[in-house]
Amino acid sequence: MKETSPIPQPKTFGPLGNLPLIDKDKPTLSLIKLAEEQGPIFQIHTPAGTTIVVSGHELVKEVCDEERFDKSIEGALEKVRAFSGDGLFTSWTHEPNWRKAHNILMPTFSQRAMKDYHEKMVDIAVQLIQKWARLNPNEAVDVPGDMTRLTLDTIGLCGFNYRFNSYYRETPHPFINSMVRALDEAMHQMQRLDVQDKLMVRTKRQFRYDIQTMFSLVDSIIAERRANGDQDEKDLLARMLNVEDPETGEKLDDENIRFQIITFLIAGHETTSGLLSFATYFLLKHPDKLKKAYEEVDRVLTDAAPTYKQVLELTYIRMILNESLRLWPTAPAFSLYPKEDTVIGGKFPITTNDRISVLIPQLHRDRDAWGKDAEEFRPERFEHQDQVPHHAYKPFGNGQRACIGMQFALHEATLVLGMILKYFTLIDHENYELDIKQTLTLKPGDFHISVQSRHQEAIHADVQAAEKAAPDEQKEKTEAKGASVIGLNNRPLLVLYGSDTGTAEGVARELADTASLHGVRTKTAPLNDRIGKLPKEGAVVIVTSSYNGKPPSNAGQFVQWLQEIKPGELEGVHYAVFGCGDHNWASTYQYVPRFIDEQLAEKGATRFSARGEGDVSGDFEGQLDEWKKSMWADAIKAFGLELNENADKERSTLSLQFVRGLGESPLARSYEASHASIAENRELQSADSDRSTRHIEIALPPDVEYQEGDHLGVLPKNSQTNVSRILHRFGLKGTDQVTLSASGRSAGHLPLGRPVSLHDLLSYSVEVQEAATRAQIRELASFTVCPPHRRELEELSAEGVYQEQILKKRISMLDLLEKYEACDMPFERFLELLRPLKPRYYSISSSPRVNPRQASITVGVVRGPAWSGRGEYRGVASNDLAERQAGDDVVMFIRTPESRFQLPKDPETPIIMVGPGTGVAPFRGFLQARDVLKREGKTLGEAHLYFGCRNDRDFIYRDELERFEKDGIVTVHTAFSRKEGMPKTYVQHLMADQADTLISILDRGGRLYVCGDGSKMAPDVEAALQKAYQAVHGTGEQEAQNWLRHLQDTGMYAKDVWAGI
């Protein structure tokens, strides 16, 4: 057990504890001083209780782990609850109204929502500009005062369509006076002794009066909106009054709406006004930074009032704001509590009764994170977001409890500071020295400057300028569209694929989309569709997988044709090949892609780029990305093309329109699937087993036939849990009907152009729990404006990190979206990035000789602790099928594998079957067929089944196998790997013990079948067979390998193992 250390504490003063060390008017400055003396962690005791203050970035990283810590509403925040109640800022995470309001209001603070607020923000900013422009020469500007007026009016107008008209008042609005006094009183209450508090009768009376003043204003805003009815407003108040929480279906009650409005009026203007004031101060004290800011503003803000797009282009202004928040975060601390007793820093014990305060100004000055110049004002440190120190920048709080209005504040502040610099020269006529003023937030105290107009002409900023500019921007964008590749001369690209499970097809369609969006004419098709029709104009790209060394079902005919044509027949064809494979099948890895690549060259085609390989058990996406880069570069060189840098490089976009009606998924058509029904669904494991294996009988449609050894493909349904998670994350309802439209081929799996419910769309069309790809993670990062969170996401796609943190833990894009709530990815883009829902293939475990109208499958239910360490992982198809009941519908199709996995035509041919666990499935069908043949009077060759399981509890089909053995249909050899009192035994061990028998059977022309795990079991079985061959025939290793390969090439050895591509 590790030794713990006491948390440092400054000197105490009797019953007052450390209270005398805290300046009641500027407590944050006192804590900063103590942190400089005590270090990155210390504790203070006051009559109000004990607080652990943390400021070192490594310790902050620990306490910001939301699995271990959550936001605490104590101290000053607890006092603020007197007038903000369970609003977003002052509610506990476990309170129902926090989650409800968070779900309802998140969309109104997204980056996209800022576009709707932009015009109103300009409206208020223009009032500030006009006020300053009308000042007399040398007349002082109260910077914090005017910024407070601006930010209050902005949140009032944008959030509630209420005008405080602060610039038309001689004195602040009564709400402001009451709010400032109430916040100040809340801060001081926590520093007073109970006896002091009781004696302050007048102060308490004023506190109640100020609260009632705020309540009266807010209640009147709500009442007026209700009286006027729905005027199609899209602001905060409209959502609070009209929108239901997608999770509970409930609306916010009027009391909570009151608390939310007060919360936003406080948080929405206090912090932003402080930010603008600090930024102004820093610019005046750093003329070189001010000069750069003026240069950017003059270059970008060319209209009277900035457009939304122009504000986004003010990158240096945003850096100034970020750096101002670093040095003086206007919300200087946030409080946390541990969910259970723990240790931080490897030695400091924290109990559930402790309260932790993250001291943000000191965190932002941590030299270990920010470097030796941490005290300096240097906006350039935010130029490259990937260099912002991890967990060392928290101006908006942490995680799901971070400030919901961050985007609102930053857009408003960027717009306002840009406009100020566009129109005014700032003058520090008083040579101001910074004096921090604190209520619950920080701002410069008594800060005055003077301004001079930078332009002699009168300032007439047009409030509508931003909107008027929009059509022009759109026109420019439309005119810019066109080919981004010069020299195509209408030459096409044909992308062909061979794919059984969808991976290769998905890659092919993505390649076609990419080319199409660069102005290239493209087509996609299965390889079998282009037999004898490879074009000699343009380029051909082939993406294909292998199945045990055999081509996919939609590529087999093409491979055969390619093999039969004469050399020289494909002269003039220009091609490139990318192969999908799995290195666990080393003997056949990339066999088909390699064969196609070599055959094309041999038959006269020209390879314009080297073949690429993607390993689905490795870094498939990284390998694909590298190949795509080189392939496109080679194509440009080979065909004499040039890149048009001025072309529109927009991605394929998916649009979504809400409608009413019904819809269906097109995936069933793409696999020629049919609707069937479940006839029986029963458990095969014993009652005391901790696993689940289902035997499922499926009543087939009239026109569907199968044979033993075939596969039954199932189009599964995503779990309701995961569908609900997505709907909740995006604030949508599953019952809503939408119509999708798309410009690219990669959306072909979606039900385009017809109504479909969001529930059905997410249930039947896309993979939602696959590990996130690097491309998906990069997209998530691009939609995340919170610098620390964006940096975290960007780091996840790095070499090594991606494999360890995403692939091995099977972290999905949905998991990441839930973790990073600041990610503002639109639902349409999320949907577009999800891969098509792939069919799951099961070996049929029955024989049509018993019942041709019914087929069974044997499904091992995948269910267990998630590799991510969070919750339970459930396989999509196996759990979907496990829950189906007799009579339920299932979408299915039959596929005959290319591996010749069928019974010998001559029933007297001896057979060896190896199938542990659910690998026994196809052999059950074989044995049923042999049973029928025997009853028909046919003579059977000997048959051996090597079955494996852990113990008697998961010995599936035991009764049937024992009956087949009793009836002389088969000899069963069972290996138990976890049976008490017996050594651990696998099927290959039993086969090694019976080497003479097995080799004798195979030498006499017997057939060998192996079904099940291809990564471990199948290679071990093959190794055992090769050793047996060596031992029996006295040969070497190479001869044994050649023998086994010959068996496979001649069809005497067939495998039904899964590569997952």
From Swiss-Prot:
Which reaction is recorded as catalysed by this protein?
an organic molecule + reduced [NADPH--hemoprotein reductase] + O2 = an alcohol + oxidized [NADPH--hemoprotein reductase] + H2O + H(+); 2 oxidized [cytochrome P450] + NADPH = 2 reduced [cytochrome P450] + NADP(+) + H(+)
The residues that hold FMN are: 499-504, 546-549, 580-582, 588-590
Q: Recorded E.C. number(s)?
A: 1.14.14.1, 1.6.2.4
Task: Indicate where this protein resides in the cell.
Answer: Cytoplasm
- Show the Gene3D superfamilies listed in the entry: 3.40.50.360, Cytochrome P450, NADPH-cytochrome p450 Reductase, Chain A, domain 3, Nucleotide-binding domain of ferredoxin-NADP reductase (FNR) module, Translation factors
Q: Where is the Flavodoxin-like domain?
A: 493-632
Say if the entry is tagged with keyword Transport.
yes
Record keywords: Cytoplasm, Electron transport, FAD, Flavoprotein, FMN, Heme, Iron, Metal-binding, Monooxygenase, Multifunctional enzyme, NADP, Oxidoreductase, Transport
In this chain, heme is annotated as bound at 403
Q: Which domain of life is it from?
A: Bacteria
Activity's dependence on pH: Optimum pH is 7.0.
From the UniProt record, which GO molecular function terms apply?
aromatase activity; fatty acid binding; flavin adenine dinucleotide binding; FMN binding; heme binding; iron ion binding; NADPH-hemoprotein reductase activity; oxidoreductase activity
Xref: InterPro entries: Bifunctional_P450_P450_red, CysJ-like_FAD-binding, Cyt_P450, Cyt_P450_CS, Cyt_P450_sf, FAD-bd_FR_type, Flavdoxin-like, Flavodoxin/NO_synth
GO term, biological process aspect, one: fatty acid oxidation
Its top-level enzyme class, in one word, is oxidoreductase
Provide one Gene Ontology cellular component: cytosol
What PANTHER family does the entry give?
NADPH--CYTOCHROME P450 REDUCTASE, NITRIC OXIDE SYNTHASE-RELATED
Relate the protein's function as given in its record: Functions as a fatty acid monooxygenase. Catalyzes hydroxylation of a range of long-chain fatty acids, with a preference for long-chain unsaturated and branched-chain fatty acids over saturated fatty acids. Hydroxylation of myristic acid occurs mainly at the omega-2 position. Also displays a NADPH-dependent reductase activity in the C-terminal domain, which allows electron transfer from NADPH to the heme iron of the cytochrome P450 N-terminal domain. Is also able to catalyze efficient oxidation of sodium dodecyl sulfate (SDS).
Its recorded name reads: Bifunctional cytochrome P450/NADPH--P450 reductase 1
